[in-house]
């Protein structure tokens, strides 16, 4: 035997996530728990981690991105992190942010209130949440619009061009969506 090889698995250590904390997803997202991260304040460990991630892609000379989406970050619950993403895309001036303004159980009036508070040419928000099939469990789940909208933008750019709106029957169909979580009336859609 010329060479001896050993494989030793990692033991102990800490990856920053406490295994005793539940990982709240989808309709369970709250300010204190989004995907296992505490985002309740600007100094919470989850908020600090997200801001580090946002800052790491903030230089347009280092990272060529044109679309940013952070499912699980809901403006109504996580405004600090949400606003940091807006600050980053506005400073870059070459990327667009698809954000979620409300959670699954929030009303259209709450979505309008949160959406009106955003004044940026670099942000798009959508409502309501969407029902889709979970590819792992083959069951119906509710996801924020920011999960499926990047695919619509990419499809739109492939069949048309960036300056065409991802709307209508040809470019605005939501591939992967089964239904919406809250069906809006005609009057609500016009607001």
Language model segments and positions:
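A glycine- and small-residue-enriched flexible loop/hinge signal that marks low-structured segments
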Residues: 1-191
């Amino acid at each position: 035997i010329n060479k001896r090889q050993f494989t030793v698995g990692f033991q102990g250590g800490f990856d920053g996530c406490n295994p005793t904390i539940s990982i709240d997803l989808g309709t369970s997202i709250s300010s204190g728990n989004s995907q296992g991260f505490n985002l309740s304040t600007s100094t919470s460990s989850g908020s600090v981690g997200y801001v580090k991630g946002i800052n790491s892609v903030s230089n347009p000379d280092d990272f060529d991105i044109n679309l940013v989406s952070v499912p699980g970050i809901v403006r109504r619950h996580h405004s600090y992190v949400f606003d940091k993403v807006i600050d980053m895309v506005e400073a870059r001036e070459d990327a667009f942010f698809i954000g979620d303004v409300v959670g699954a159980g929030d009303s259209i009036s709450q979505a309008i209130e949160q959406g009106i508070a955003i004044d940026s040419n670099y942000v798009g928000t959508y409502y309501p949440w969407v029902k889709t099939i979970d590819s792992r469990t083959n069951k119906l789940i509710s996801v924020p619009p920011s999960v499926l909208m990047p695919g619509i933008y990419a499809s739109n750019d492939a069949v048309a061009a960036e300056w065409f709106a991802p709307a209508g029957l040809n470019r605005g169909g939501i591939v992967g969506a089964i239904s919406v979580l809250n069906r809006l009336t005609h009057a609500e859609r016009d607001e």
